[in-house]
Amino acid sequence: LYIYQMTRYYSNIVGKYVAQVTSAIKKLSGLEIKLICPSHGLIWRKDIAKVVSLYSTWAQLLPEEEGVVIVYGSMYGNTAKMAEIIGRELNAQGIKEVKIYDASKTDHSFIVAEIWKYKGLVIGSCAHNNSVYPKVQPLLHKLENYGLKNRYLGIFGTMMWSGGGVRGIEAFANGLKGIEVIAEPVEVKGTPKVEDVARLENIARELAAKLIAERN
């Protein structure tokens, strides 16, 4: 539980300063550290090496575990349905850790912490004023600001007229180095149809194949 809170604090507060963290770890590498006394949190008297190792991993923006975070914004429930379809297929393909979050209901600090932990990320948004849904946009801004990398990304969303949600997520992905977009983004008009389900499941299958291929 406390490790999770460490991840949440690091990813949301320290995440932008990866270069400084890496530099500090190198400077301290020759010292025998007996205590870690952070300005926020518990004092560490043991497991020092584990704490330093975690910070080193986080500073490199390396995922800790195999798994996928699916986060979406939905006005009428259609984008939420798409998220569930992808999540179920990921489970069916053998990915056990699949976390699905509604960006309108879960505080983004918790979502960011989970994204820091897992290699797979799938983001979905309905179109809103020719752009990304307002509850998803701040999350994209945070991840862009932190320079997220070393992740596989799937993209999906819904539209009725000119779209904009999927287009906005694609622009976000194009602005980041070290993010690999998996499969073709899926944009659906209204509620997902049978053919749309197949395309969504394809995102899940391709993402699962990438993750499984990296198993030791």
What are these regions (language model features)?
Residues 53, 100-106:
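Short gly/ser/thr-rich secondary-structure transition/capping motifs
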Residues 67-71, 154:
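Conserved beta-strand elements of the Class I
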Residues 77, 107, 162:
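Flexible, glycine-rich phosphate/dinucleotide-binding loops
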Residues 35-64:
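Short N-terminal or domain-adjacent regulatory/targeting segments
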Residues 71-92:
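Short, charged N-terminal beta->alpha structural module
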Residues 48-49, 81, 166:
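A short acidic (Asp/Glu
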Residues 72-75, 103, 157-158:
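Cofactor-binding loop segments of dinucleotide-utilizing enzymes, especially the Rossmann-like FAD-
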Residues 1-43, 85-101, 111-216:
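FMN-binding flavodoxin-like domain, especially the glycine-rich phosphate-binding loop
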